[in-house]
């Protein structure tokens, strides 16, 4: 009897195409609902203050760059995307002469930001950037500082909003 029942169920599923009808029902159900597609260039979805986008270097309020060339970000980077060269200043402090980030290698993990003792390198909410020529994938120190100067007010606001979670 059990074998006959199994055959009956098999033939009902096969000839009535229950899987196909279930798929069609799902399609019909979603066909008449409101669309949730975002038209990307014209519409923007809200970003979290913790969003990890393009990297930037920050400055102190007096205009001096924050990076002290400790090279912790270079050491902690799992993708080996950061290259730092430094030299001693006359006053005995170290400063960077070269700070490059290869954006093809960068995986936007945020470990460089977490390891920085002076909050020099930060991630910004910028997520639309493109590369149209060879060599533009290397973010030099000047480019990183320019992005940091451009985004400083928003970075401060995002850090203030996120402070209780740090």
Curated annotation (Swiss-Prot):
Residue sites binding [4Fe-4S] cluster 1 per the record: 67, 70, 73, 116
Gene Ontology BP annotations: aerobic respiration
EC number: 7.1.1.-
Binding site for [4Fe-4S] cluster 2: 77, 106, 109, 112
Gene3D superfamilies: 3.30.70.3270
Membrane topology: Peripheral membrane protein
Protein location: Cell inner membrane
GO molecular function, one term: NADH:ubiquinone reductase (non-electrogenic) activity
Enzyme class: translocase
GO cellular component: a single term: plasma membrane
PROSITE patterns to which the protein is assigned, alphabetical: 4FE4S_FER_1 (PS00198), 4FE4S_FER_2 (PS51379)
Family recorded in the similarity comment: Belongs to the complex I 23 kDa subunit family.
Subunit structure: NDH-1 is composed of 14 different subunits. Subunits NuoA, H, J, K, L, M, N constitute the membrane sector of the complex.
Known role: NDH-1 shuttles electrons from NADH, via FMN and iron-sulfur (Fe-S) centers, to quinones in the respiratory chain. The immediate electron acceptor for the enzyme in this species is believed to be ubiquinone. Couples the redox reaction to proton translocation (for every two electrons transferred, four hydrogen ions are translocated across the cytoplasmic membrane), and thus conserves the redox energy in a proton gradient.
NCBIfam families, per database record: NuoI (TIGR01971), PRK05888.1-4 (NF004538)
Name the record gives this protein: NADH-quinone oxidoreductase subunit I
Gene that this sequence comes from: nuoI
């Amino acid at each position: 009897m059990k074998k006959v029942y199994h055959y009956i169920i098999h033939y009902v599923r096969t000839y009535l195409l229950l899987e196909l009808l279930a798929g069609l029902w799902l399609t019909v159900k979603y066909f008449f609902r409101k669309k949730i597609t975002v038209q990307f260039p014209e519409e923007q979805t809200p970003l979290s203050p913790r969003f990890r986008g393009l990297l930037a270097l920050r400055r102190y309020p007096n205009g001096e760059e924050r990076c002290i060339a400790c090279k912790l970000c270079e050491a902690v980077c799992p993708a080996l995307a950061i290259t730092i060269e430094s030299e001693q200043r006359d006053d005995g402090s170290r400063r960077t002469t070269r700070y490059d980030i290869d954006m093809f290698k960068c995986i936007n993990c945020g470990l460089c930001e977490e390891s920085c003792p002076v909050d020099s390198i930060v991630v910004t909410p910028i997520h639309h950037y493109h590369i149209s020529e060879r060599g533009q994938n290397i973010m030099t120190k000047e480019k990183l500082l320019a992005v940091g100067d451009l985004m400083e007010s928003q970075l401060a606001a995002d850090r203030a909003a996120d402070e209780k979670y740090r």
